């Protein structure tokens, strides 16, 4: 992963403003839009130590995450008082397993991930610069089973007004990246003048958006 050092430094210095202390309300509100079944497998790319993993594990029998930072993976299990089984894999990755949860620590692009029926992306696509997004989407498309669905949370703002991450990924770019799949925007939350991104960072506009992306093949 080409920006690995950047993310290792973020976790090492605890600069993790992207981490939410609670389950993302957009997940709990819109997960049902995927018509998920308990037996369907779930993948959470670039998962950090998100609380969303624990929530998803209450809904599904197998939830798999992938995270570059070993600090993040170990913190997730420690903060939940879980004692995982740890398996080294080919010297490049470690697999952490506890009940319904499995997390691969290491490079997402080379981790031996299982194919998934459902993918949840809250902070993966928007964490990557434009030149890496095509490779990332090719990777998750290759990991999605026929008939699989993706719940994607994205941001839309004038990129020239703020350096990412998180980056702006517009509906037009999402439709281009996932060409051949069915893309539906479920939700758009347009920030008002009191939102920190506008009031404090001076953006002219900012919105958070939720998409369902379906693999009809």
Swiss-Prot record:
Its main location: cytoplasm. It is an enzyme of class 2 (transferase). Gene3D superfamilies: Vaccinia Virus protein VP39. It comes from the Bacteria. S-adenosyl-L-methionine binds at residues 11, 46, 67, 122. HAMAP family: Thiopur_methtran. This is Thiopurine S-methyltransferase.
């Amino acid at each position: 992963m080409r920006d690995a050092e950047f993310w290792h430094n973020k976790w090492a210095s605890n600069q993790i403003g992207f981490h939410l202390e609670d389950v993302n309300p957009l997940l709990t509100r819109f997960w049902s839009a995927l018509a998920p079944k308990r037996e369907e497998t779930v993948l959470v790319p670039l998962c950090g130590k998100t609380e969303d993993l624990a929530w998803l594990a209450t809904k599904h029998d197998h939830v798999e995450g992938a995270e570059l930072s070993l600090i993040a993976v170990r913190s997730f299990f420690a903060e939940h008082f879980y004692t995982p089984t740890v398996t080294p894999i080919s010297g490049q990755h470690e697999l952490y397993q506890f009940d319904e949860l499995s997390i691969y620590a290491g490079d997402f692009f080379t981790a031996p991930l299982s194919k998934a029926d459902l993918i949840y992306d809250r902070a993966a696509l928007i964490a990557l610069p434009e030149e890496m997004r095509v490779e990332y989407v090719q990777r998750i498309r290759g990991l999605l089973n026929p008939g699989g669905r993706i719940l994607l949370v994205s941001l839309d703002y004038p990129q020239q007004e703020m350096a990412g991450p998180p980056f702006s990924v517009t509906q037009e770019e999402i439709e281009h990246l996932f060409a051949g799949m069915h893309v539906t925007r479920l939700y758009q939350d347009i920030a008002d003048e009191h939102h920190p991104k506008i009031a404090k960072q001076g953006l002219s506009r900012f919105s958070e958006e939720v998409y369902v992306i379906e693999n009809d093949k």
